[in-house]
């Protein structure tokens, strides 16, 4: 008789789903045909019930997908508590336009975000705060780490504790090194999971979850570069720049785009140094992109 267990999908590739069962390890599973018939696709992050088919080989079938807390469009994952976006403080110089895109994608999907600046050992404290203050003033938590010097790791672990965190960032920022710092070597199960799902052989093309400790997971997600959010209208973009809200009532025109109109409270705040000019320039570029998307 098949034995049923509950676990979490930590990776899905080529129709196989790797399910982490706490205390038992990783089971390689296939989804039952009923999901396909109902047009339901299991997602990385799903909590599932599996029927164990072969205990020795650790094979099973996914019998049930438990109710989802949430499901993101991009990346296509489920049951995320928060997101962590990692950028290098230097080498490479942070691309703030890319950072803003990620923040908007997560805000749109109602996922709280923490910003992590890695390689903080390459800059002075004053240099770090010059750009991190911009985001802290917008309400985003910011943490500083150095994977090379093992700095800030405990503070980062505190933010991750007990949560499922989607981790993203452009290449070259030390994301893999930082993820390795978060996995204590004494946890043999984590090492076994890495071997089972062949972690580290490829760049991140598929989302996968890495257990850090009990009830604490990080989800390594593929890179991001475009603002591809179905349903986001250019007129709504300013809502995702929280620092605009205070000055929007000062605009002369209702529905002001904060770009070409005269007597715009947001533009006046930029000129007065109350809103970051860098953030405002990113806003204008993203607004134009959304405008162009509508043409096609």
Functional labels for PLM-detected ranges:
Residues 7-9, 62:
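Conserved hydrophobic positions within beta-strands
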Residues 122-173:
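Canonical P-loop GTPase G-domain recognition
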Residues 17-21, 29, 50:
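SH3/SH3-like beta-barrel fold
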Residues 3, 15, 33, 39-56, ...:
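Helix-rich effector regions associated with P-loop NTPase G domains
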Residues 55-71, 81-98, 114, 121-125:
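Conserved Switch II/interswitch segment of TRAFAC-class P-loop GTPases
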Residues 96-144, 282-285, 289:
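Charged, amphipathic alpha-helical linker segments immediately N-terminal to NTP-binding catalytic cores
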């Amino acid at each position: 008789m098949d034995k049923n267990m509950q676990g979490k999908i930590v990776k899905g590739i080529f129709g196989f789903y790797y399910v982490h069962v706490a205390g038992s390890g990783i089971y390689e599973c296939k989804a039952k045909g009923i999901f396909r018939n109902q047009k339901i696709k299991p997602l990385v992050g799903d909590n599932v019930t599996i029927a164990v088919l072969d205990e020795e080989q650790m094979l099973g079938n996914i019998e049930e997908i438990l109710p989802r807390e949430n499901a993101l469009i991009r990346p296509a994952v489920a049951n995320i508590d928060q997101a962590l976006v990692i950028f290098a403080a230097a080498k490479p110089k942070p691309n703030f336009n890319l950072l803003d895109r990620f923040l908007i994608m997560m805000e749109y999907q109602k996922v709280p975000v923490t910003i992590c600046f890695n390689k903080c050992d390459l800059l002075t404290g004053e240099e770090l705060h010059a750009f991190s203050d911009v985001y802290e003033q917008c309400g985003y938590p910011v943490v500083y780490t150095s994977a090379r010097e093992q700095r800030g790791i405990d503070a980062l672990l505190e933010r991750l504790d007990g949560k499922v965190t989607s981790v993203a960032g452009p290449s070259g920022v030390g994301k893999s090194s930082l993820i390795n710092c978060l996995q204590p070597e004494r946890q043999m199960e984590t090492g076994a999971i890495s071997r089972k799902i062949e972690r580290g052989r490829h760049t991140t093309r598929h989302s996968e979850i890495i257990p850090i400790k009990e009830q604490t997971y990080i989800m390594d997600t593929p890179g991001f570069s475009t603002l591809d959010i179905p349903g986001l209208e250019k007129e709504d973009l300013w809502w995702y720049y929280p620092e605009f809200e205070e000055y929007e009532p000062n605009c002369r025109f209702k529905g002001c785009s904060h770009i070409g109109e005269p007597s715009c409270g947001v533009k006046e705040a930029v000129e007065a140094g109350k809103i970051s000019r860098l953030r405002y320039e990113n806003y204008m570029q993203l607004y134009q992109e959304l405008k162009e998307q509508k043409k096609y």
